[in-house]
Amino acid sequence: KKYVFIIDEINRANLSKVFGEVMMLMEHDKRGENWSVPLTYSENDEERFYVPENVYIIGLMNTADRSLAVVDYALRRRFSFIDIEPGFDTPQFRNFLLNKKAEPSFVESLCQKMNKLNQEISKEATILGKGFRIGHSYFCSGLEDGTSPDTQWLKEIVMTDIAPLLEEYFFDDPYKQQIWADKLLGDS
């Protein structure tokens, strides 16, 4: 049986201090009892710790958060890194909204607008860039009670989530903030 250990926001801590000697045991070729280490605070000298071969460690991190330290190289080499792109072009996201009773034209318009906004964010390489693009997860909640994705639902997301984010992103250009909020809410 396989097990997954997920660490969200893995870059929020000093990972060398959190993991200590266990960091070595995370490597795929250092798994199992042969690589076990004694437990520092154990009363029993025979107690040892190892990471089993059937445990997969997944660390999630938000690279757009500037207040966080970069992951140190000692940890970085123990993980494979995969970028997760915004999913506006995926059939899964579009089908999710369609299954929630969104109109196909509404879904198409939303995806086009968000892709254009993300292109704009990516072009702002000096202060923003690719890592700051807005993901599809903003549009996956608020539908649990049977609400259908429509213009009122979109307005709420834009006004409470996206517009404040744009204020941060384009802090030096209030005009650009407003233009993009209007574009997301408009018919064009």
Regions found by a protein language model. Name each.
Residues 1-188:
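C-terminal regulatory/interaction module of P-loop NTP-utilizing enzymes
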